[in-house]
A protein has these predicted regions:
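Conserved active-site regions of diverse hydrolases
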Residues: 1-293
Length: 293
């Protein structure tokens, strides 16, 4: 989610070199919605889910019926550790650092406006960069389970810090079917399955350790595999590749210039992201599922 005070194309607020922020800065910040406002070419799942920042333009999260406060960083891995997964940019904020940032600056600001933590849902969806980077640096014949365990261990140690602040409702989303994507030929279905199984085991353990918490695990992998299996029912024309002109300023009005049909007819936005249309489809399923929980 792009913010007016964020690093362009990467974040809602700040970066590794601008790590701290004041409540005044956070509340003057606005969600930016346009072609480059997300990594999907349009609204993403948290914007669709909350209804906050869906329309083009600038949006104040406090004026949304469901407020959206996004502290994720584009291109982030879970762990910032030399020799494990590479830092994509020197300004990248890893998940561990994102949560440090939230604990130190985000939560105090939200407490200052009396955010009702009993009505807050903490959502965590990470792992695409982790699994891709591990196979890129170690090779597809490596044994990845220990690395996946390490990642999940660090995720939930960080989530523990959010729990300690008084948040009790958590949503975790597993990896999508990267094995069927255009940019990840080295990532196979067994890797994705292993990563997701280890993730689920850690989420279950977190639930068992905290009886006062509600842990929700959304299986987006199954949802999107089903969409891919029946893609024509959703209006998709291309589910194996992405439009090479996806990030061009005139792509929405002239996709044919790049040899493409409309972006909404593509499942994949680029080698590592789903289109906004795919996010919209999965979020409809997610919303119905959440209501039943």
């Amino acid at each position: 989610v792009q913010g007016t005070l964020g690093h362009t194309n990467y974040t809602f607020i700040g970066d590794e070199f601008n790590f701290s922020f004041t409540p005044e800065q956070l509340f003057s910040n606005r969600i930016v919605q346009n072609l480059t406002g997300t990594a999907e070419g349009g609204p993403n799942w948290v914007e669709f889910l909350t209804g906050c920042g869906v329309e083009d333009g600038l949006h104040d999260p406090r004026e949304c019926d469901v407020q959206l406060w996004d502290f994720a960083y584009a291109g982030a891995n879970t762990i910032n550790e030399a020799g494990f997964t590479p830092l994509h940019h020197n300004h990248t904020v890893s998940l561990e650092r994102q949560i440090e940032q939230f604990v130190s600056y985000g939560n105090p600001a939200l407490e200052s406006i009396h955010l009702n933590k009993k009505k807050a849902l903490v959502a965590v969806w990470i792992g695409i960069n982790d699994i891709n980077d591990l196979v890129s640096t170690q090779g597809k014949n490596a044994t990845f389970a220990p690395s996946y365990e390490k990642i999940q261990d660090r995720i939930f140690k960080s989530v523990e810090k959010i729990y300690d602040l008084g948040y009790k409702d958590f949503l975790f989303v597993n990896l999508p079917p990267l094995d069927r994507g255009p940019g990840t030929p080295k990532v196979n279905a067994s890797m994705v399955s292993s990563f997701n199984e280890i993730h689920s085991a850690h989420a279950n353990a977190f639930q068992n350790q905290h009886k006062d918490v509600k842990v929700l695990q959304f299986d987006v992998n199954s949802v999107l595999n089903s969409v891919l299996d029946h893609y024509q029912d959703y209006g998709f024309k291309n589910v194996t590749d992405y439009c090479p002109g996806y990030n061009q300023p005139d792509i929405l009005i002239n996709p044919g210039k790049y040899g493409c049909t409309e972006l909404d007819t593509f499942f994949w936005y680029n080698s590592g992201h789903l289109t906004s249309r795919t996010h919209e489809i999965m979020t409809k399923v997610l919303r119905k599922w959440l209501v039943k929980q």
